[in-house]
């Protein structure tokens, strides 16, 4: 009996709950319908609103309007969000440069962008170009940037060179007032003309350009491309000169955009060249984007070695880097074309992103949208310190390859000028030959830059500063590395500010296995 009553009570309770829920749903539907018919709001506490006192605030008006006007909002928000997603996705490498994706594949194109960073400097420079301001483009690179292997009439400046391809494309998009200036004596931006300055030097790396970059392109350069990875050894000492080079570029008053280009070669002891190992971390520290032909092509070439013949240059029959008629150190026409298209695609990607950013912001104020930032106060290659600040560096260079500050002795006995193609030196081959230079320093550092090789028969020289012969350095031109390139040495780093004399003497002793003595000086540098 009791169980029966309990079951009946439970059934009534469930019925009452269902009825209550249904009644509340019906009431809500009626309220919404009431509002849609424009019959005013309904006060849940006291019945229908008294419309005779419209100027008296009603606490239920807000609730009614929320139902009436805010209900469609989520649909509109979703639509807007989807549109923005489409815009963002439209700024993709394969959309702005589909032909590159077709050639190397989307994955390899993405790999080519080794480091993107904020791109604020690059976007600032592109924003100036889009406003119609003239621009200068400079290159700090080695023999690849000079176009060795293109086998054209003008490898360095001709239209087949990858840097010239980039410049011509930019000049077409953002033409100056007159004809573009291809390696003029100096900047012609004052005349409204765009300028191309290929400052590349064969057989040098970051240690040369960290001190001598002012000799090879104007200080009001807007776009700077670095291409020294192939010429760098896989040693930690490569990092600091590369860092000093970056700081020197980024500290220019013209606020240049700097892009680090990393090439590819198959003629060295390591499959991946030293710069591809030693440069990326430093570039990231300074927010400098890096584009890598090595990353783009290496997977394809490892799977299909015959592609080396497509992307690299025809080699000299007696060349040390020539294998089966192909120069495995210098890319050819197709390699230059691909590298240029990768860079152009990356620049297009930035301009696409700029369109989106400026549309969303409703303006194109450069300083607000693309803040410049500042150089890190410490060196990436230095030790952490709570308060230390790296001083601004103003390097000075006397170079055999410079038209501005040519390396010229104040005293000379047995040394002479000599050049091979675009490389210039002061050389001596008779032991006992002496030469003296004068150079100024502000922070007390003087460096000598000289060539090293395993095959040219290089000997030894002794160099010192002022009369401090006891602090002389013995420099060996010979080494067993597969590079014929320049290397720097710190002659002194403790000198007082002012002008100092640097002396060098060719020695009888030599490290060359063949007993030869020739020694080549490229430049003298100071800070």
For each of these PLM feature ranges, what is it?
Residues 48-91:
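Fungal extracellular Ser/Thr-rich, low-complexity intrinsically disordered regions
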Residues 117-124, 205-217, 240-248, 274-278:
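Alpha-helical scaffolding within the catalytic cores
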Residues 2-51:
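N-terminal signal-anchor transmembrane helix specifying type II single-pass membrane topology
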Residues 11-21, 30, 85-108, 314-527:
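Conserved catalytic region of serine esterases and O-acyltransferases that act on ester linkages
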Residues 227-231, 246-277:
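Active-site segments of SGNH/GDSL-like serine hydrolases
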Residues 138, 145-146, 150, 206-239:
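Oxyanion-hole/transition-state-stabilizing segment in secreted/luminal serine hydrolases
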Residues 121, 257-262, 274-322, 337-356:
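Extracellular serine-dependent O-acyl
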Residues 90-199, 214-218, 446-456, 464, ...:
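Serine-esterase "nucleophile elbow" of acetyl-processing enzymes
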